[in-house]
Amino acid sequence: MSKIVLNKGETVHIPTSNLLATLSWTASVDLDIYAFYRAKRNIKPRRGLFGIGGVEPGQEGKIYFIDNGSLKRFPWIHLDRDAGVGDVGGQNKETIHIASLDELEHVLIAINIFDKPHTNFASYDGKVTLKVGEDLIEVPLVATDNCRWCVVAHI
C-alpha cells in the first residue's frame, strides 16, 4: 500500500470504480462531505421502481447528509453517516463510497463547514483520504481563505 499527500493544486489519476473518500476530524465542528454528480449525456434513460433509482441523460444530483444515496442503484454512490452533528468533537468520520463511475460524466467530492459563517478550514484539523485500490491519497484541509466550501477531488 502506498500513500500520497496532495497539496493545493496538485493532481493524481484516479481509476473509475470502487473509490472511498473519508473525511476525518477531531475538532468541535460539524464538517460534511458531499458528492456532486452528473450522469453521462449518452446513457439510455430508465425509470426506477416507484421513482427511485431511475436516471436521465445529464441528470445532476448530490449525495450528502440528507440523501445518503445507494450502492444498489443509480448513482452507485453512498454516504455512510453524518458525524459531528452539533459541533461534537472526537474521532469523527464520514465516508462516501463510489461503486462505479460507468454511468457518470463526473463526480466532485467537496467538504462543507456546516453553520459557521466567517471561518476557514485551517481553523480545524480535517483531512480527506481517498482509497483507490491499495493506494491512499491524503488531502489535508488547510485553506486559510474565509470560505465554508472546499472541492477536494474532480473525478
Could you describe each region identified by the protein language model?
Residues 1-106, 110-155:
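Intrinsic-disorder/low-complexity signal
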